[in-house]
Amino acid sequence: MLMRSFRYWLCGLSLTIASGAALAGFVPEQAGVEVLDDHRGQHWFWIWGSNAPSMVDGRAYLFDDNGRNLGLLSTGTWSNGLVMSQQRDELYATEIYFSRGVRGTRSDVVSVYDARTLSPKHEIPIPAKRMSALISTGLSVLSDDERFLLVLNFTPAQSISIVDLQQRRFVEEVPIPGCASIYPAGPRDFYAICGNGGFFHLRLDEQGHVASQERTAPLFDPLQDLLLTTGMRRGDEWFFVSQKNRAYSLRMNAQGVALQQQWSLVSDAERADGWGIAGNHGTALHADSGRLFVLMHKDQPENYQKPGTEVWVYDIRSQQRLARIELKEQSTAIGVSQGQHPRLYSLDWLVPMPKLFTLWVYLTGGDAGLAPLLRQGINLYDADTGQHLRSIGDIPLGFMNVVMPW
């Protein structure tokens, strides 16, 4: 018994000496803040969404062109994503918080983040009315000179909160009954699309107060052909696609809004074969080349927001299709970087298992059997040639529904 205790004591002593020697050479890692390079020209991109089923912790993730995760932002309950400044190294997020996590007093803020460190710089309180929606484009927009941020509200009464980013203060709230999705059209002019097919034109003065407001005559019939609100801008032109697979070009500026042109995205034969628009954020525009990218699939017309399998590319001048890009996975959202050598980004749903096993699960359990296995991934393509470049299959769990080039 005594010898056994002595052996234990010697063993403990040797471990203490060994660990002491190891600790003597140990240099603790110092916590710090990484600083990102300039994002311009890097083909970096963000993805964001509600982070379902954990909607109280909305997320936005930053990736580089090689698929490396560079950072993330936690953007409050049911993220509406980010608004990216082109003039300042700043990012803006309209965020919702509750004093007890999922209950209690609600507070809405515009959070301003440093684009190099992703650290919060300051908050601007706004009315606790910010709209939350699956389609997040047009819910928060910058004026062209980036002085003001406009935030869409829904209580269910519709209104706009005006925020002065220079003075870091809430200016005022403007009712816009029956209208939604905001589109900037100059330093002080904005439009919101309305349920009757017209637009609400809002003009601000230099302090951010309302200088004038008016409703336009209807430009389209929403009962015959409903425009999707995910518009894309090129100068003073905005491009939309409709539920019946048409493209619309609208000119918006300080003088007013006017329909410029419209054309069909599909031929009669393609329409009869079931081809149509797809996805939650299924359109993108490369401004320099004038190319419109539209996510498409074969399905029933009423399923126009289900995932897509191809991206069709159109010349907005000739209104002709230039290419069809077959996707590796089913996509819910696309984005296209600007400048030379653009990238096409596809935010996809996938089952990370062999295809035969996936087919067996679908045949035996249908959509309900596949749903628990679904994960999200990203695929990158050369937007000029359609060549697949790489896949990013290991993105965090949670429903992401926007991919946005930075």
What are these regions (language model features)?
Residues 2-10:
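Bacterial N-terminal signal peptides that target proteins for export
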